[in-house]
């Protein structure tokens, strides 16, 4: 086969491939989740509720830590006057108080702690409603992919405002802006 014929075949293959890729072009949309959440009062209320309960629980943990610290200082001041048995008893009490504080901290703030559960119960309905609305808009408009402009992992450098559906999501959720 000569070079001219090979070039023609290659050109036809490239044109065919390009037309196939163009025909299956996907539509994309952007949204700004931070913007959407800031415009949903229920989200702001849930965040405030989480902050209040977090502060309350943190104060409980700090109170136990302070108590353990006070017990330790008292022990340090009186150690020379204590018998071995009294020393052991005080050390055990201090360690018990520190463990109590640590356990309480884990209970409230651990990976499966009360704060996590509270956040899940307050935020899940809001997130689910947003997701369903985004899905509905995407299916209606034929978007194959909707990216979050606010997400650090999305890696969006530029997004045209023409494809940003944030306001439409808010409008469908009943929050006009």
Residue ranges and their predicted role:
Residues 11-12, 36:
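General alpha-helical segment detector with a strong preference for membrane-spanning helices
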